[in-house]
Amino acid sequence: MDLGHVGIEFGCRRQAINPGTEPIEVWLQHLAVVPHQHFPRVIGHAQGFYLGEYNAPHMSTRSIAITDDITFGGDHPPLFIAGPCVIESREHALRMARTLLALRDELKINLVFKSSFDKANRTSVESFRGPGIEEGLDILRAVKEETGLPLLSDIHEWQQAERAAEVLDILQIPAFLCRQTDLVAAAARTGKAVGVKKGQFLSPEEAKNILDKGHEVGNDRVYITERGSSFGYQNLVVDMRAFPILRGFGAPVVYDITHSMQKPGGEGKQTGGTPQFARPLARAAAAAGADGFFMEVHDNPPAALSDRTTQIRPEAAREIISDILALRAALPPL
């Protein structure tokens, strides 16, 4: 494949494809090449396998409205989603929300407060899960009433969707549940924005099927969050190619900074992590085209009741957000 000359080389035979011409199809031994905005789409036909998709530069995404005042994607400013991993108490949630509200005002950013009312996917049965949906939503409602911040939390069962949508602005589907059709559809039917974590076991290309499930029930406010891919046992890596691939499906893409630092099960009954890589990878994702950034922020990570090895302090969040804003201002859009 020679993308520099926009053509294809197969064996000893070469077929050039000139930019600006009408779309054509070139068949070479069961291989089809369909030009699309100067870059070809490559599809394997003989064995029915997928070889990949090269999207044009300057690929714009549609925007998604989170509230009347906050929209992200397209030409809009980046969205930041931040808060403690799990609701530890009413007092702690409110304290962290106040801290993040001050950070929002200081940096003049669009920010959504996140915290989980139930961590149903904890490594161990002994791990803290949170207050549950009723108390958890009551606490999140109090956060919104005091700070005015929009809210995100996870749902784990389709029956929770309508109840959660009464309080939340974004319903999030956890990575391990991203292929659960009934769950994704129920969240989408609420009409709220839906963020789906791409499972560690999925390729970026497969995530389009998740978006299609939301669109099928009439909701075009569904987006994908990249949170790393399994790389052997107890390790995740972030493939930066995922961002242009996911954006090529037309929806904005969020990068989950802190969960991609995880070492799943790395501490036996708890997940380990490498938070020292949060800042460089956040910079890389900003350069690769991420439209939003998710981070779990805690005032005392070593004492956190969940993900203590990957949550970051507010001052670290400030540094990361400042980096992202500087990069976004310096780089042309992809």
Language model segments and positions:
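Catalytic beta/alpha-barrel core
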Residues: 131-132, 149-157, 169-182, 193-204, ...
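Short linear motifs in low-complexity or flexible loops
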Residues: 7-8, 16-21, 31-35, 40, ...
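Active-site-adjacent loop and "lid" segments of alpha/beta metabolic enzymes
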Residues: 126-134, 151, 170-177, 233-237, ...
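Catalytic alpha/beta core domains of metabolic enzymes, predominantly
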Residues: 191-297
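Glycine-rich, proline-tolerant flexible connector loops at the mouths of alpha/beta enzymes
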Residues: 80, 84-93, 112-133, 298-308
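N-terminal amphipathic alpha-helix/helix-capping segment at the start of soluble metabolic enzymes
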Residues: 59-80, 332-334
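Alpha-helix-loop-beta-strand connector modules within alpha/beta enzyme cores
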Residues: 102, 128-151, 187-193, 244-251, ...
